[in-house]
Amino acid sequence: MNAILWEKLSGSIEWAAEEFDGVMGVSIKDLTTGNTLSVNGDEQFLAASSIKIPILVELHKKAKAGTLDLDTEVTVHDDVKVGGTGVIKELGDVTLTIQDLATLMITVSDNTATNVLIDIAVMDDVNATMEEL
């Protein structure tokens, strides 16, 4: 990202943080330049659905390395289904590929798909990859 765009982005985020009625945390790193921007970056927040992007990154990393086949089928049984958003909870036992689970995790924020993919991606690996970035 060029310097002018970076300055605009930085200014917009800093303005939003000042105007926001609450506590906001944002951390950005331009992977091409190494530039970083952080507003309350040392504060801890509940991850909620924001964890879904790092999980997706880890799945992609493992697929690219050849250690994970996204076409692998996984059967999701009722005992692992959770409430909240998503469609898997409404189905009986269902067999889906890892790719399909990832698609549901991102497109409809499916919490059951997310939980299944956490086990596949391995949360320690997800955290390590995020630290590397």
Pin down the residues of each PLM region.
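Active-site-adjacent loops and short helices of periplasmic peptidoglycan-processing enzymes
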Residues: 1-133
